[in-house]
Structure formats: structure tokens, C-alpha cells
Amino acid sequence: MTQLARRHDLTAVMAVDNAFDADECHCAMQAYCREVVLVPNPLGREGVTKRLLQFRSLVSIRSFERLRVTLGAMRHTLDAILSTRRFDIVNLEFPYLGHYNLRRAPYGRTPAPVVVDSHEIAFDLARQFAGANGGLGRRLYGGVNWRKLRREELRTYLGADGVYLCSTADEQRLLGALPGLRTAVVPNAADVEYYRPRPTDPPPDGRTVVYFGLLSTIPNADGVTYFAQNIWPRIAAVHPDASWKIIGGRPSPSLLALAGPQIELTGFVSDLRPHLASAAVVVVPLRLGGGTRLKIVEAMAMGKAIVSTTLGAEGIEAVSGRDLLIEDEPAGFADAVNRLLAGPSLAARIGQSARQLAVNRYGWSGAAEALEGFYRQILEEAP
């Protein structure tokens, strides 16, 4: 958005629930947008309201994800904006918002093309979550819900003028379901000038392992739990002076219970850079998820040595052994971390290569150029 705002006028329409500070969100978006319209979403993400919405979805043909963003106020807001103002492109950020009528325009004008940003293939992610849920009831509910979401998501893609994805792997998955769909790959990108090694940064302490991400999400919570149970004990046995820092907001009680002499949970931090700068190793032990992980791009931009699972690094054009280390078994993952903790020169070499890859392939300017090229292609072929 920062890059697009330099060359285009942007209008943002967003639903905001109680997990976000509306004023803070508005101020942040205003820096880049001509106009920011926030629509309150009273349908909660947690607690009783979430459970009621899940119950509604049981007796509905609609998925939970769709019900959670079906708002009369959003429909009226979009109708008012699209029918009175002219836009060149309507960019839809998530496919489960595709039920809103985006084919509106001022009288006598042709509606703008609709382009969907598929951060990940949502139904595939929901399918993974359904299989990972422990109880039979949750698995049955998840199995029904992801199939509803698949129908809704594919319908949104079919109705759009184009879909862009974060990785070639996701693009191929989607084209397998919808051959002939107009797609493009726009990689997840980081501000490589913001995330960069700085002379003022403290040097890595040589013993700190870092994981970061929003801890309320299923992939992050599962990854941290998996690492704590299966990998961290193997690291601590070899390096008893090592510490593990878990950075991210909204941890569950079970994750908070991990805190101890060697394990720190920081909660949300406003600036990741000092924490990443002090890390000897960044770990991405993910077993669930889709798209590409921005956390890897940010850590690469900071010149960090990373150990990841294959899934965690999916979609990143990195070579294991050069730009990061990839291991899928607990013993191999722990051994990779131990080698980096014991070999700072190896960690430095991998970190330097990772930084170069981030600058060359995953900077904001390159991603913005790829997206603008896709926009131009769609506009040139529009009737």
C-alpha cells in the first residue's frame, strides 16, 4: 500500500471488530489513503458471540467465515461509495467478502474490474484446521465448514476479473480447481529498508532463539506448541544456557504456561527489530498454513539465520543450506538450531545470503510493480 499510494489515489473500506483499535487503524491507513471508511463489526472473534455464530453456521448454507463478515452496514457503505465515485480497480482483500455487490458504478459508467487478493487459499487452510482439531465434534464441524467455504471462495474467484496469490504453489493449487482463471503471483514482501541490520543494533547474544507471530492464530499456536513439546527440549539439552523468546500478542493460557527460566513470552511488541537483532536463530516450525509467511521475509531482511519446516518456507524462493535451513523432523530441526547456536560464522553466512535474497526478491517496490503490472493487464483487456 505504501508503494501504491505514491502513484495512485487509494480509498479503503474496512470492517473493524473489537480486536482492533479503530482510531489507531484509521490514523495508520490515512497516511496512505485519500479516504478511509471503517465499518464496525459487532460479530466477535472470541467468546460467546463467536460460539453463537458457529451455531448459526451449523444450520446455514453459509460458512462461519462468511457469516462473520456479513454486515448490513458494510453493504450500504459499499453501495454508497461505488455508486457515487469512479474507480479504476476494486481490490478485494479476502475471498470470503465476495458476496458483496462490487459491480456498481455511477450512473452511465462501467463498473471497475474486481481483483481478489488471495493471501492464502482459505478453504485449504480451513481443511487443514479441521483435520488438526482434536475432538470429534470439532472435526465434524470443521469438515462441513471448509466445504461451504470452498464453494463460496471458488465462486468469488470465478466472478472476479483476476486473482493474485503469494506463491506459485498456491497459484497451481487454485488453477487445479479452476483451470483458465486469470492469475498472477505477487510475493509477500517486507520493507527491506525498515527491516535491515543497523549499526546501532545490539549484536546477537549467541544463545537466543526467537519465534514471532500472532499467537491466537491456529498455525502459530500449533507451531509454538509443537516446538515446545518436541524440539526445544533437544536444544536445551545441548545448550542449557540457551533461551527461547516467543513474540506475539494474544497467547492462550496454555501458551502462557510455557513461560519459565529459559522461555519468555513478550506479548505484542511495537517494534520487532531489536528483538530480531538480538536473535541468534529465528525458528518457523509451522505444520499448518497457506500462502507465504511474512515472518520469514522480515527475518531474512534482518539478516537472520532461520530454521523452518518445508511448509513454513513454502513459496519462498530460498535454498536450504544457503539462505536458511529446512528440517521437518524434530531431531533434524533441533540439530539445525544447535549447529547455528554453536557456529556463529555459519549463522552469519546464512543470514547474509538471506538478506540479499530479501532485497533482490521480496522488497516492497518489486511486489508493487508486479501488482501494478497485473492491474494494467486487466485494464487493457477490459471491455
Per-region residue spans from a language model:
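N-terminal subdomain of nucleotide-sugar transferases
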Residues: 1-39, 85, 237
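Donor nucleotide-sugar binding/catalytic pocket of nucleotide-sugar-dependent glycosyltransferases
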Residues: 38, 113, 123, 142-197
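Conserved nucleotide-sugar donor-binding subdomain of glycosyltransferases
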Residues: 47-103, 137-159
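Acidic donor-binding loop of glycosyltransferase active sites
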Residues: 161, 263, 277-291, 302-305
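Short hydrophobic beta-strand element within catalytic cores of glycosyltransferases
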Residues: 295-298, 305-309, 325
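Conserved acidic donor-binding segment of nucleotide-sugar-dependent glycosyltransferases
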Residues: 324-331, 339-344
